[in-house]
């Protein structure tokens, strides 16, 4: 008798069958260039599985199973939610509830991410009436199995209740609110392919609005209706296809629903599209640029379509227009409208005129859909002849020189791609990412952010933000020179080579072609060449050294250049990331500006006179504090000239008041106060010096979540360390006054211990740093005078990094004289001034450099 093989239970067989079908589709998703057919196939396979479960659960024919949302549209990405509605007749037996629960449970067991609702027709209509999300999901409802009559009754009731105008207003408001969550820009470093501005949700929103209004449910139907042109329909289909493919591949690569194009997945996603790294660009940068261009096109076309749909749903009650440029432009309901569809073909110089009128005409709040469409379809007109036309060059300069509206005009020029077609080198950096770990914007967005920051200096209502910058720009003649420099300072990023030198050549050519001559042209070119110099001097060099100030003053040469460079530098740093700027950096730059201005005004950078001035100012402050007249001498007699040059009068007075009674203290004295220059804590440490002191202090800060911004280390003549630190708390909303006493007590107790230095904590790197690690660099060299050694360190930022460096130095008994801690987002560029004793030995230098590289390695 032959043995029979037992058949697997139906549920197991069905699960294996569906799993195999889905796996086969997922494999095809990995390489398919057009995923819409696969999305439909996955939807059909899911339909079949749900029908089978429905029948197995014995659900009666009086019910209906309805697909809603994206599933209703028949489009499923590999790991999308499967949204279903179980539609009930008005009267139904309560025992159905158990069967429905079993059906939904079995669907989950099948591996489907089910989103379910169980409602009658009345309940659906009621829910949709006060929840636009429910109303939207039901718009694309599709029957899978069950009662056709019930489903048709539901759809009839739904359509009768749907108010197209109210739906339009709700969806446009919803879209604006969604865009606001992403700062109204598609240029996020980790965009959400579905939800970000210019993403799939924008395209879906337009089709939902059009469908609700009865205008059609596809790009072809909207084309037929006259809402878009053939060319626009092709562009929409092409970009929609790319975004769908990108989202599907993200799902497959992540093995789950993943709509955010996170750093960790960007390289794999890029490789799935065939991008390969080049000497100039990573594969991920090439993919991201394509994404940004697609999102930008979607944003442009969505704006046109929404305005067109709005015009049909809400016909204008008044046709009153105002002529702005005869035969070219009128103002209609607050929008700039072309007088005829072929204005730009007949008058190419009207293209830039549109932005000048938008900028300069009160009451004009934007460009109409008709104007935007004409711009979009006039790309062929924007050719070399158009760029060389003297009329366009004059208009471009007029746009730059208007008293207001410049930022809005340039942003709109970029959104409509006109700016990149006029400045071809600008077009090259549109959508270009910057993986330098501190820029959080693409190059084009960063440039426009810098332009915006300079403009804000000149706007009275923003004068409270940076009062010193606002004060300077008020008296700065022809500020448009700064705007030109802002446009060109990073325009050569990503070409390979020195972007400052390459950008200089671009700026020089622009000036020549646009009639900018003499000192103005020279200033623009010089600013582009040296736009990084002031921040490097302020943050990496010892600005208490008169030689440093004198050398910088010689480079600058004039007060106008100094002011221009200062304003551009502040705007540039502010335009990299909200995290990079802080008030401490602002103070360093302002101090450098004032010291350089004094030299340019004829003051000689003389250490002796500066020493005398600082001491006199400090004594005046001490008298206000009722410190006895000669009480300061005991401390000051132990301090060298360097101490007085590195600290301002207010700090000298504070430290003297704290220490004049304790010059020969037996125990550590620690005092802390909120920093006078910004949101930070200033910590004073006075204790008998030892080789591991700096490392021990850094260890305490590291363990307590305090980041060091600046360290000024001094050794008195009688062997005491007088160290000053500016630190910030990594947690937000900390009240430094509240933690000052705690820091004083804990740090003093830590310094009283004789325990060995603890092992550095290997803090966790951010995802950005893990994905785009920078090559750590260590440079150790003698300074120009041979008095100290300068240690420069560049690495990914992480908790414990400064202490790791300090510990290596302590182990080799290398003293730290000063430290400039420069944190740029996820990157640090620190500079230390070290005691030269012993470092003249080349073997020790090499050993220290080697161990430092090991300590800072990712």
Swiss-Prot record:
Region listing for Uridylyltransferase, in residue ranges: 1-324
Stretches the record annotates as Uridylyl-removing: 325-681
Catalytic activity line of the entry: [protein-PII]-L-tyrosine + UTP = [protein-PII]-uridylyl-L-tyrosine + diphosphate; [protein-PII]-uridylyl-L-tyrosine + H2O = [protein-PII]-L-tyrosine + UMP + H(+)
Regulation: Uridylyltransferase (UTase) activity is inhibited by glutamine, while glutamine activates uridylyl-removing (UR) activity.
EC number: 2.7.7.59, 3.1.4.-
One GO biological process term: regulation of nitrogen utilization
Swiss-Prot/TrEMBL cofactor(s): Mg(2+)
InterPro entries membership: ACT-like_dom_sf, ACT_dom, HD/PDEase_dom, HD_domain, NT_sf, PII_UdlTrfase/GS_AdlTrfase, Polymerase_NTP_transf_dom, UTase/UR
Domain HD: 443-565
Signal peptide start and end residues: none
Keyword annotations of the record: Hydrolase, Magnesium, Multifunctional enzyme, Nucleotidyltransferase, Repeat, Transferase
MF (Gene Ontology): [protein-PII] uridylyltransferase activity; phosphoric diester hydrolase activity
Residue intervals of the ACT domain: 682-761, 790-858
Entry domain remark: Has four distinct domains: an N-terminal nucleotidyltransferase (NT) domain responsible for UTase activity, a central HD domain that encodes UR activity, and two C-terminal ACT domains that seem to have a role in glutamine sensing.
Family: Belongs to the GlnD family.
Protein purpose: Modifies, by uridylylation and deuridylylation, the PII regulatory proteins (GlnB and homologs), in response to the nitrogen status of the cell that GlnD senses through the glutamine level. Under low glutamine levels, catalyzes the conversion of the PII proteins and UTP to PII-UMP and PPi, while under higher glutamine levels, GlnD hydrolyzes PII-UMP to PII and UMP (deuridylylation). Thus, controls uridylylation state and activity of the PII proteins, and plays an important role in the regulation of nitrogen assimilation and metabolism.
Protein name: Bifunctional uridylyltransferase/uridylyl-removing enzyme
